[in-house]
C-alpha cells in the first residue's frame, strides 16, 4: 500500500485490511481536559442560576443581558426580517420533516405470551426537552426544525431552546422563525456550556428539562456528557461532523467534490473520507476540489478540514463498503452504479444518501430525514434522532388466575434458585389462592 500525506489529507492506495484502523481513526479529543474546563462552569450555574449564566454570557458571548428569555415581540419582529424565499424554504423543509417523522409513530398491540398473561407497551412523550442550537460562524436554524418538529409530534409539553445571542443581545431571526414554525414553547439567549447547565439544572428563568438534544463545539459536547452522568439524559455522544463518499468510474467528479467540500466547510475539525475504485476518478475529484475551493467563502475552514481527510483507492465497491462499515460515518454517500446493491450491505452509518443526485445537503435541510446524527464512530451503536428519541416505552402486564397458573411455578422456582425468597413468596401466595 502507498500512503502519502498532502495538503488535502492522506492518500491510501489499495490498503490492506490491517490499514483500515488507520483509515478509520479520527482526530484525538482530550476529553479529560475538556471535562475539567466545563465542570467548574456547570457547578457555578447549578449553585448560582441566572447570575452565573449572565456572567458567562458576558465572558464567552461578549454580551450583557438584562433578560435571558426571548419575548413574543422579538419573535414577531424576526418574522419581518425574513425574506419570502427563506420563509418558503423553511416551510418546505418543515413539511417534509414533519411528514417523515409522523410516519414513525409507534403502534402498540397486546401480546398473550401464554394463557392468561397479557403484555403490551405504551409510548409516552418526554414531558420537558431542551434543544441546543449553535450560533457562532453559521447559525443552524435548520437544526431547530430537525429537533423541535419531532418533539412536537411526540407530544412533548415543554420544548425549550437555548441559542447564543449576538453582541447586541439578539437571536438570529431565522432561528426564531424556525422555532415559531415548529412550535417551540420557550427560547433563551444562552450559548455554550452555560446553556447546557441552565437546561440540565434549571435556573430562576430557565426550566429544568429531562433530556437535552443538539450539536455544538467540543465544550458543549463535554458539558452534555458531564450532565448526563447524573442529572439529565442526552441525545447521543458526538464529535466533529464527517462524511464518507463511495465513488466509481461512473460518478460525477463535480458532484463528489461539492459533497466533500460541503462537509469540510462545517468546521476545521470536520473530516471527509473518499473511497473510490477508479484512480482516474480520484484525480478528477482532487482537481475539482482545488477548483471549487477557490470560490468558497469559507475556504480557509475547508482547507483546514481537508488536512484531517483521507482519500482511498480500492479494488472494488465491496471493499469500499467494508471500509465504510469499519469507519461508521455520520453521513454516507454512495454515488456508484451499484448503489442499490451496496445499500443492502451498509451496517454502520448515521444517514445514507443513494445515487448521483442525493447530496448530503438534501438531508441536512429538506428531504425529511433528521440531520442530528452520531459521529466519531458512534454510528456503530447509536442511531440518529428520530421520533422515538422523544418518547419512552412503558411496559404493562396483566395476569389472570389462569396466568398465575401458567407461569407461577416457573417464577417460584427461578426466585428460589436466585435465593430471593420474598420474590418467590409473592407468587407462591397467589398460587395457593387459585
Predicted regions and their residues:
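Conserved small-residue-rich beta-alpha loop and adjacent elements
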Residues: 111-177
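A glycine- and small/hydrophobic-rich beta-loop-beta segment
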Residues: 266, 274-349
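C-terminal core of ALDH-fold dehydrogenases
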Residues: 326-434
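Conserved NAD(P)+-binding/catalytic subdomain of aldehyde/semialdehyde dehydrogenases
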Residues: 183-271
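Short acidic-hydrophobic, aromatic-tinged amphipathic segments that line or gate anion-handling sites
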Residues: 3-15, 186-191, 311-316
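Flexible, glycine/charged-enriched surface loops at secondary-structure junctions
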Residues: 106-111, 233, 270-275, 295-305, ...
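N-terminal Rossmann-like NAD(P)+-binding subdomain of aldehyde/semialdehyde dehydrogenases
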Residues: 1-127
Amino acid at each position: 500500500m502507498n500512503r502519502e500525506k498532502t495538503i488535502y489529507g492522506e492518500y491510501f492506495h489499495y490498503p490492506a485490511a490491517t490499514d483500515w484502523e488507520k483509515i478509520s481513526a479520527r482526530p484525538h479529543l482530550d476529553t479529560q481536559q475538556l471535562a475539567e474546563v466545563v465542570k467548574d462552569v456547570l457547578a457555578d450555574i447549578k449553585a448560582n442560576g441566572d447570575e452565573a449564566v449572565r456572567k458567562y454570557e458576558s465572558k464567552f458571548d461578549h454580551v450583557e443581558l438584562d433578560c435571558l428569555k426571548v419575548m413574543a415581540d422579538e419573535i414577531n419582529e424576526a418574522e419581518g426580517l425574513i425574506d419570502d424565499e427563506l420563509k418558503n424554504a423553511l416551510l418546505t423543509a418543515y413539511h417534509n420533516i414533519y411528514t417523515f417523522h409522523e410516519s414513525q409513530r409507534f403502534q402498540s398491540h397486546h401480546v398473550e405470551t401464554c394463557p392468561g398473561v397479557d403484555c403490551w407497551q405504551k409510548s409516552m412523550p418526554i414531558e420537558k426537552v431542551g434543544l441546543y442550537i449553535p450560533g457562532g460562524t453559521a447559525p443552524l436554524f435548520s437544526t431547530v426544525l430537525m429537533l423541535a418538529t419531532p418533539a412536537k409530534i411526540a407530544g412533548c409539553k415543554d420544548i425549550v431552546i437555548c441559542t447564543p445571542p449576538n453582541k447586541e443581545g439578539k437571536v438570529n431571526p431565522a432561528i426564531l422563525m424556525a422555532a415559531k414554525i415548529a412550535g417551540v414553547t420557550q427560547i433563551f439567549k444562552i450559548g455554550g456550556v452555560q446553556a447546557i447547565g441552565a437546561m440540565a439544572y434549571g435556573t430562576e428563568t430557565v426550566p429544568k428539562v429531562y433530556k437535552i438534544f443538539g450539536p455544538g463545539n467540543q465544550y458543549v459536547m463535554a458539558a452534555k456528557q458531564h450532565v448526563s452522568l447524573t442529572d439529565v439524559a442526552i441525545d447521543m455522544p458526538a464529535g466533529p461532523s464527517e462524511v464518507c463518499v463511495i465513488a466509481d468510474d461512473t460518478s460525477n467528479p463535480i458532484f463528489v467534490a461539492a459533497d466533500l467540500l460541503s462537509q469540510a466547510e462545517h468546521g476545521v475539525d470536520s473530516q471527509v473520507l473518499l473511497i473510490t475504485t477508479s484512480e482516474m476518478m480520484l484525480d478528477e475529484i482532487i482537481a475539482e476540489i482545488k477548483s471549487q475551493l477557490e470560490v468558497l467563502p469559507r475556504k480557509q475552514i475547508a482547507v483546514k478540514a481537508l488536512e484531517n481527510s483521507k482519500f482511498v483507492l480500492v479494488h472494488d465497491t465491496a471493499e469500499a463498503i467494508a471500509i465504510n462499515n469499519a469507519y461508521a460515518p455520520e453521513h454516507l454517500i454512495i454515488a456508484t452504479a451499484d448503489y442499490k446493491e451496496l445499500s443492502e450491505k451498509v451496517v454502520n452509518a448515521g444517514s445514507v444518501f443513494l445515487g448521483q443526485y442525493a447530496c448530503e445537503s438534501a438531508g441536512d435541510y429538506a428531504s425529511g430525514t433528521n440531520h442530528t446524527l452520531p459521529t466519531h464512530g458512534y454510528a456503530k451503536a447509536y442511531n440518529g434522532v428520530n421520533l422515538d428519541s422523544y418518547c419512552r416505552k412503558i411496559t404493562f402486564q396483566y395476569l389472570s388466575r389462569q396466568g398465575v397458573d401458567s407461569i407461577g411455578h416457573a417464577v417460584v422456582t427461578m426466585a428460589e434458585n436466585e435465593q430471593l425468597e420474598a420474590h418467590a413468596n409473592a407468587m407462591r401466595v397467589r398460587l395457593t389462592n387459585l
